Design a protein with these regions (language model features):
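A Rossmann-like FAD-binding core segment of flavoenzymes
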Residues: 37, 63-84, 89-91, 96-97, ...
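FAD-site-proximal beta/loop scaffold in flavoenzymes
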Residues: 114, 120-135, 217-261, 266, ...
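FAD-binding core/adjacent interface of flavoenzyme oxidoreductases
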Residues: 1-7, 72-139, 214-216, 238-246
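Short loop/helix-cap segments at secondary-structure boundaries that form the rim of catalytic
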Residues: 39-40, 114-119, 135-137, 158, ...
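Beta1-alpha1 glycine-rich phosphate/pyrophosphate-binding loop at the start
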Residues: 4-57, 65, 140-174
């Protein structure tokens, strides 16, 4: 068991890990190479560098630093977080991790496909959170748009109450093929309905009648996890206090998922605060 689990290994996540690990707490960082920092061509406004550095290099240096201190760094996709006596974080390929505190630091980006009707029916049959809205579709037909581990996890959540089909919008991934959940690999044309969603249309002319459409494309962001856990979210940012604590005890957030300014220096500072706050939380809990 890790005492602290950090989801996201960009500057906020790694910064948090430096503080939790140096405080003597077993720390696991889970993330993918799909951070905003990794895509930055040149960074020249960060303290301590006499020459500009590209985002990929700064990212790699952070990972090396975390590993040198003894952090457990896992390259994987987090698909769910559950709270029991401790927090249980499930990944796509490395199983489940348990921790006394969780720090969310995966950013807030969510890819929204350019599908006609998607925006129009948000809140009227289009949802981004299975655990939040599954109840409303009990014994109904629903679709999940997505083509990876996150889409499969959302579909399994819905399967307990509804008749679910995964729509991969193209060639299905192995995760989808092996999930045991019905899927269609047709290209999506639109989501249609009148006052609410009635179905999904495909480019080959076929249609699928459903009452709800759940969007689960790519990997889940901190905002996705926040909504599933009942964390306060305003203006697409997780609400935190001065200690980076959310409204849920033991869950902290740092970086782009809660910051008004998307800068490396802000992410690093918030990560440090979140890490120290997680240490304080666990010590007080024990």
């Amino acid at each position: 068991m890790s005492q602290v689990i950090i989801i996201g290994y960009g500057p906020a996540g790694v910064s948090a890990a430096l503080y939790t690990k140096r405080a003597g707490f077993a720390t696991t960082i889970i993330g993918l190479n799909k951070t905003a920092l990794f895509k930055a061509e040149k960074i020249e406004n960060y303290y301590g560098f006499k020459e500009p550095i590209n985002g990929a290099q700064l990212f790699k240096e952070g990972i090396v630093q975390a590993k040198r201190l003894g952090c457990n760094v896992i390259e994987d996709e987090v698909i769910s977080i559950a709270s029991e006596s401790n927090f249980k974080v499930k990944t796509a390929t490395n199983g489940e991790f348990t921790g006394a505190a969780v720090i969310l630091a995966t950013g807030k980006q969510r890819f929204t496909p350019n599908i006609a009707g998607l925006k129009e029916f948000e809140g009227r049959g289009v949802s981004y959170c299975a655990i939040c809205d599954a109840f409303f579709y009990r014994n109904k037909k629903v679709a999940v748009i997505g083509n990876g581990a996150y889409a499969v996890a959302e579909a399994k959540e819905l399967k307990a109450v509804a008749d679910v089909t995964i729509l991969t919008n193209g060639t299905a991934s192995e995760e989808v093929k092996l999930s045991g959940i019905p899927y269609l690999d047709l290209e999506i044309e639109n989501i249609y309905g009148e006052n609410k969603v009635n179905g999904v249309g495909f480019k080959n002319g076929h249609t699928l009648t459903v009452s709800g459409v759940f969007v689960a494309i790519g990997s889940a962001s901190s905002i996705d996890f926040a909504k599933k856990l009942g964390l306060f979210v305003e203006n697409n940012r997780i609400v935190v206090d001065a200690k980076q604590q959310t409204n849920y005890p033991g869950i902290f957030a740092a970086g782009d998922c809660c910051a008004a300014l998307s800068q490396v220096c802000v992410a690093v500072a918030q990560g440090a605060v979140a890490g120290l706050s997680a240490v304080e939380f666990i010590r007080n809990k024990n």
